[in-house]
């Protein structure tokens, strides 16, 4: 067992939290969900166990996601969630100090939102906290050489936000963050199934539909799955069959929003860097980058080769882990980079 404090890299996502422990790799991979007894304030479950309680809890128990669109929406619950996950990450160490932590944040977050993340991590047990932009962490985790003058583009499509960035010489040249990502696709499925089929489904079921038959580019074969929900009129259980071609139509609008944003960032980028990107290609990371046809859609839209990184779910966490080597020469707070921020409200 180690006798010193662990340095941790944290992908604090809207849908999932991944924690990288120096020398060990990713040691925590849990949904960003907390279940709490409202009467006592006691945390009952965190992570996968809490996620399984969504929509199934008695009146005194609430299962919730304390982050929304990439930022903290419930400070107290975020602190309690991080306390449990930090404890899980360092349980194999006889640490004498609290850990130093690098946490990713979406591009273009405000100083207030940055401070909220830092405060939550400190209250959860971190000794020092450093922030890194998600696309920079994603690029590091995907193995891109961003130290050279040659430009690279990363599109990180997570649960709460899509972050698009052009990187060069260890910095972010142009970046954008929009709240159109995995959760928006899930919500679109929920609305469609209720409106068209008169069946009410929950977020867990919607995510299963997205993963199994969801697509943002036409499939050569129309695949299907059987879904069980509650009839909106009778309240009774009801099964229905959904097809990928149907979900493709549901996904058209949010997919277009993401493609529009990628194109917009390219238009804000210098011609020299755009030339580099055309040569190097666009790298996709994040869980929702694995939506069937996302790479094809963006390639058709931009005319640039697009590829999904290896283990795209973990790229940001691994990037935070690589950035741990920087913190001995840094001051606490955001990792300062020369960058041009673009924030859009979609």
Go through the PLM ranges and name each one.
Residues 1-157, 165-282, 289-346:
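Nucleotide/phosphate-binding catalytic cleft detector across ATP-hydrolyzing
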